Structures are given as structure tokens and as C-alpha cells.
Amino acid sequence: MIMKNISYCLLAGLIFGSCSGKVYEQTDNGVIVKVQQKGEQNARLVRFQVMGDKLIHVSATPDSKFADSKSLIIVPQEKQTPFTVSQQGDTITVSTKEVKAFVLSSTGEVWFTDENGKMILQENKGGGKTFTPIEVEGTKGYSIRQVFESPDDEAFYGLGQHQSEEFNYKGKNEELFQYNTKVSVPFIVSNKNYGVLLDSYSLCRFGNPNDYSQLGKVFKLYDKDGKEGALTGTYVPDEKSGAETLVRREDSLYFEHLKREDLSKVVNLPENFPFMGAKVTYEGMIEPSQTGEFKFILYYAGYTKVYIDNKLVVPERWRTAWNPNSYKFSVNLEAGKKVPIKVEWVPDGAVSYSGLRVLSPVDPKEQGKQSWWSEMTKQLDYY
């Protein structure tokens, strides 16, 4: 009987201990929090590491432990910064003398205030971190997205050098990759007196996490004769070339890459057509299935103009044929309403480039938030 009572006491103690156990572990430089909310795309662990009185390193992973590869952009800490850890309900707080970092153990939601409690930065309400498994050539990782709330009067500056004619990236989209005339840095400074640095080395996107779509994936296309399924492409050669005018249907305008096996030819453009001195027109109608602001990206070399709904939406732009560039613009369209579209292109070279793709409308409130996406990484890391 005595042995039974002892067994019951031990069992009760184990149950109570497991229920009352801490949801966080304090470390030498911060805290690790176990997120209680389950979900395949959710974080299981969130970590704060204090890097300075105003600098917090935030990590999150859907795995049972952190993948902690050596950062290629962060220098080692020379000294530790004093901090405290406290818990109130399911909120764990790490405090320095100038900033406080909070995380909800229930959802993993994160936010930051100054020492007086004034909000600095808040993760998307309900949780702004998602992880999607990805595997490339046997290497596993995650496509991650991190979203923060953003007031209407906020401005974002940074992201590197993109020749995009954009300065304030609030409500804008930018792809972050390295290119001949494009220098990408996943770092922004806010007019609200804080900055965010995403520690990721893969393709990233600020703003809309989706890739631009081919026109035919978003719109119904009609050629210049009204036949559905494509636009009309008309290729008029230089008179001196002796070639004939070529007319064909175009289900997309995507002439942005050289063929690997023949670097004198561009993917999807007609072969054996003399582009030097030629004039090209793509025209027809587009019909959206949604109403709203459609965001286009024009890839261009040579001389290019774009008309939509009989309006010149992109005045003539020029770029040397061997060094193309991108230009972003937006047009409001109405669901079910066909509008004319025309692209006039003078390649200005034997090998030249052209492309027009589009993003479907996004809720303006969502578009205005601070959104980061990384194609492939081991875990989420930002400062």
C-alpha cells in the first residue's frame, strides 16, 4: 500500500512538472522560446540574442534545433551586453537598457519596444513567420517569409542599388539578387527610427513574395484580330536585310535569356530573324479576371514604349542592347473589361532583350506591410 502511494505521488509529480515546465531557456546572450502552437509551416523555436543595447538577433526554425551556420555578414561580438529575461503569462521579454524584445510562447509572435514601452516594430498580428520545405540537388532548406505590421506613414529606404527609380520602398516590390548593374542588400532603414537586416544569401524578395507571372497566366489574351489565346507579334526587318516581315502569335512576352547552347540567340525569339535595324510590335487585348492595381515589370534593351488602354504608360526607354534593365509600373484594370495593349520595341542590336510580366492585385493593406521572402535558407535570421 505504501509503495502504491509512493508511485502515485511520483506520477503526479511528473505530470505536474511537465505541465509547469518553463517554455524558455535563458542562454549566455539571450533566450530560446519553445512555441506551443503546432503547424507544419510554423516556428517551433524562437531565439533572441542580445548583440548590443539596441541590437537584437532574432532566429526562428520549424525544426527541433537551430541550424546555426557561420554568418557571412556578421562580425564576432567583442563583449556581452547586459540584459534581463522575464515572463508574464505566455509573454517572454528580453530587456536591455534601451530596447525590449517580446515573444509569445503560444504563437511565436515577436515585437519590439523602446525602454519606455513605445512600439518600434511588430510582427504581423497572429504571427508573421512561415516556413515551406524546399530541396535543391539534395540540399534541404526552407523558403521563408517574414511579415511585419507597418503604419501608413512609414517609409522604407535601402535594399541596395537597383536603378529602379524608387527611393521609398513602402508598398513597393523588389527582387534581391546580384547582377551586372544591380547590387542587392537585404537591409532597410525605417523613418520610424529602426532598421532590419535579413541574414540570407539566396534570392530574396521585398514586398510581394510571388514571382511576376507571364501575361497569359493573369489575363485572357486576344490577338489583333480578336482571336483568344495570344497577342500578335509583328517583326519588321531592316529593308537592307532582304528578310521578310514575320507575324506570329505570342502567348507570352518573355525574351529575357540567352540560349545556353548558342549565346547569339535569345530564348523564345524567332530564330534566323535579323534583329539589327528591325522594328517589333506586340499588340492585342488583355482581359483581367480581377479588379485592382496590376503591377508590371518591363525588361528592356534597345528602345521600348508600352501602351495599355490606349494610354502611353511607359514613355520611350532606352538601354544598350548588351546590358538590359528592368522598369516597374502599375495600371488599374477592371475585371472582365478588355483593354488594348501594345509594346513597340526597336532592338537596336543583333542580340537584344524584351519582356513584360505582371503581378495580380494585392490587398493594399497587405501590400503596405514590411514583407521579406527568401527562396532557400536553413532558418530565419534577422537583426
Where on the chain are the PLM-derived regions?
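N-terminal accessory segment at the very beginning of proteins
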Residues: 19-218, 278, 293, 308, ...
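Extracellular/secretory pathway-exposed regions associated with glycan biology
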Residues: 212-295, 299-382
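Intrinsically disordered, low-complexity peptide-like regions
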Residues: 3-6, 197, 249, 260
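Bacterial Sec-dependent N-terminal signal peptides
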Residues: 1-30
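Sequence-pattern detector for short linear motifs
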Residues: 7, 73, 148, 251-252, ...
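Hydrophobic transmembrane signal anchors and adjacent membrane-proximal interface regions, especially
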Residues: 4, 10, 106, 219-221, ...
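Generic detector of ordered secondary-structure context
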Residues: 11, 40, 179-180, 228, ...
